[in-house]
């Protein structure tokens, strides 16, 4: 009995060659629309879909394959006489192979000028239906949705006259993943169109970007997936110019670093980061000086860290950076001379380019945190704050220099793991106290790191002080200005302690926990 294949593809890469090989193996080809035209033009003899259905394509191609002669040929179980008799009685010929890929919905909605009508018109109906029918009946039918699988199918057909069950099952699994992702993307698009912020079902679509050697530790398996609709300003979209593949920990740290740099748009800024915590932030009138400040913030912790810059890297800055062992450098661009310096002297240094012109769009993306048995979803901590809304709660007002430093510190503290404390001046971090289980321990840690650089320094806390002992420690160190959210039932005790020591303290009213 002659084998029959149905081919209907929007991605025509390799399809002519695939069909030609099937013809050599004696297969009969059914095809539709543009695919049939492409095959006919290449001299591949095909049968029109309407010759199989006995029904013309209609409604601009919306209705062409949704017919019993197609789906009966796909779904008939070869091991059930009743199915085969029903097919014979209804003059339905069996279809043994389906090659289908879908209307380019994703590519359509990524176009900057796409209309809602264009998006709707590129929702495939017949394609997913054929794929699912064939995949369901994979015991008898081979289904191909990915041109990358053409070769393995042809090899098995040439060698054995049919594909193996293992291959058919694997291809069916790929089809169900593909159609699920396709529908999920459509659901995501429609959900956004109607402004639904809390859908009762959440479907997310990601594509494998990079298999990883291992995860957070060598005993953990890991892979890196990218959103089906890419976020332009993200580590997933960064272009790697040099160095080894990014590791699991590299990617997490790099993501944390580029989130921080978003808050420092106005001036040349360098952020150094280690284990998801900033270890140095420097801000200046030029990027070379900003690097100097970031490095001086903590020249020990920056070793083996990640650095992100928000201005082009020039040769002078590159010369300074190459003398420090770094895992990753991320910047919007590099001069040719700077890139040559970094690459020539650091073969394994991971150098990434990430344009910073899409930062605001990245801020609206939700954050997902996996827990065993569930997923937490929240919007990012990107609330717009203004010093005009802050409240000075002490008798002493901040000086102009202190006010600038407090604003700098408040931007930085948002990215320190809770309980988080940071000590800064108006252009660089001086001490970081992250992740302690009591706040006074974080205060002591940050102050100890800042040590002899406390003259004119300010301190920021990501959450309120539960007791006045924090203020006591700060005053004892000689720091004169504090910024914190406020909101403790004992706020007055902290205010009185600040007044006692002549400190100025600002309440922002906004907490910035980071776990």
From Swiss-Prot:
Gene Ontology biological-process entries: 'de novo' IMP biosynthetic process
Reactions mediated catalytically: (6R)-10-formyltetrahydrofolate + 5-amino-1-(5-phospho-beta-D-ribosyl)imidazole-4-carboxamide = 5-formamido-1-(5-phospho-D-ribosyl)imidazole-4-carboxamide + (6S)-5,6,7,8-tetrahydrofolate; IMP + H2O = 5-formamido-1-(5-phospho-D-ribosyl)imidazole-4-carboxamide
What keywords sit in the KW lines?
A: Hydrolase, Multifunctional enzyme, Purine biosynthesis, Transferase
Mind naming one GO cellular-component term on file for this protein? cytosol
Keyword Hydrolase recorded:
yes
For this chain, one GO molecular function annotation is: phosphoribosylaminoimidazolecarboxamide formyltransferase activity
Q: Which family does it belong to?
A: Belongs to the PurH family.
Q: Where is the MGS-like domain?
A: 1-145
* NCBIfam families for the chain: PRK00881.1, purH
Q: Which InterPro entries match?
A: AICAR_Tfase_dup_dom_sf, Cytidine_deaminase-like, MGS-like_dom, MGS-like_dom_sf, PurH-like
Which pathway, metabolic or otherwise, does it act in? Purine metabolism; IMP biosynthesis via de novo pathway; 5-formamido-1-(5-phospho-D-ribosyl)imidazole-4-carboxamide from 5-amino-1-(5-phospho-D-ribosyl)imidazole-4-carboxamide (10-formyl THF route): step 1/1; Purine metabolism; IMP biosynthesis via de novo pathway; IMP from 5-formamido-1-(5-phospho-D-ribosyl)imidazole-4-carboxamide: step 1/1
Is the tRNA-binding keyword given for this protein? no
Matching Pfam families, A to Z? AICARFT_IMPCHas, MGS
SMART domains, per this entry? AICARFT_IMPCHas (SM00798), MGS (SM00851)
**Regarding domains, what does the record say?**
The IMP cyclohydrolase activity resides in the N-terminal region.
UniProt-listed Enzyme Commission number(s): 2.1.2.3, 3.5.4.10
Name by which UniProt lists this protein: Bifunctional purine biosynthesis protein PurH
């Amino acid at each position: 009995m002659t084998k029959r294949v149905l081919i209907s593809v929007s991605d025509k890469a390799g399809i002519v060659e695939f069909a030609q090989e099937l013809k050599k193996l004696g297969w009969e080809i059914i095809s539709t629309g543009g695919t049939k035209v492409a095959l006919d033009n290449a001299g591949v003899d095909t049968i029109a879909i309407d010759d199989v259905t006995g029904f013309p394509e209609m409604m601009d191609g919306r209705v062409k394959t949704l017919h019993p002669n197609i789906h009966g040929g796909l779904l008939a179980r070869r091991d059930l006489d009743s199915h085969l008799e029903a097919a014979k009685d209804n003059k339905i010929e069996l279809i043994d192979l389906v090659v289908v890929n879908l209307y380019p919905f994703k590519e359509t909605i990524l176009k900057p000028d796409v209309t809602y009508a264009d998006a709707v018109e590129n929702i495939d109906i017949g394609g997913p239906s054929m794929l699912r029918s064939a995949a369901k009946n994979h015991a008898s039918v081979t289904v191909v949705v990915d041109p990358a699988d053409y070769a393995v199918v042809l090899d098995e057909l040439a060698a054995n006259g049919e594909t193996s069950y293992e291959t058919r099952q694997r291809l069916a699994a790929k089809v169900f993943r593909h159609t699920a992702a396709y529908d999920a993307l459509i659901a995501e698009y429609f959900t956004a169109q109607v402004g639904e912020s809390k859908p009762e079902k959440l479907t997310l679509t990601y594509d494998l970007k990079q298999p990883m050697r291992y995860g957070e530790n060598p005993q953990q398996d890991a892979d890196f997936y990218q959103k089906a609709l890419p976020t332009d300003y993200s580590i997933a979209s960064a272009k790697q110019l040099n160095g080894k593949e990014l590791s699991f920990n590299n990617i997490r740290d790099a993501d944390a670093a580029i989130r921080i740099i978003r808050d420092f748009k106005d001036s040349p800024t360098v952020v150094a980061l280690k284990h998801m915590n900033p270890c140095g932030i420097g801000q200046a009138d030029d990027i070379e000086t900003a690097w100097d400040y970031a490095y001086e913030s903590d020249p020990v912790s920056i070793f083996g860290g990640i650095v992100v810059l928000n201005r082009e890297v020039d040769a002078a800055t590159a010369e300074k950076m190459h003398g420090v062992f770094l895992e990753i450098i991320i910047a919007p661009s590099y001069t040719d001379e700077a890139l040559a310096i970094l690459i020539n002297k650091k073969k394994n240094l991971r150098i990434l380019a990430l344009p910073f012109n899409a930062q605001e769009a990245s801020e609206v993306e939700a954050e997902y945190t996996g827990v065993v048995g569930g997923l937490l979803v929240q919007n990012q901590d990107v609330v717009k704050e203004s010093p005009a809304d802050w409240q000075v709660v002490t008798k002493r007002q901040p000086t102009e220099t202190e006010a600038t430093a407090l604003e700098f510190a408040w931007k930085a503290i948002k990215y320190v793991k809770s309980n988080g404390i940071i000590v800064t001046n108006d252009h660089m971090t001086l001490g970081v106290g992250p992740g302690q289980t009591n706040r006074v321990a974080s205060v002591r840690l940050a102050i100890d790191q800042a040590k002899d650089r406390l003259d004119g320094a300010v301190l920021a806390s990501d959450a309120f002080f539960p007791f006045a002992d924090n203020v006591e420690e700060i005053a004892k160190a000689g720091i004169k200005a504090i910024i914190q959210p406020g909101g403790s039932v004992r706020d007055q005790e902290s205010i009185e302690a600040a007044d006692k020591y002549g400190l100025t303290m600002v309440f922002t009213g906004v907490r910035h926990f980071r776990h």
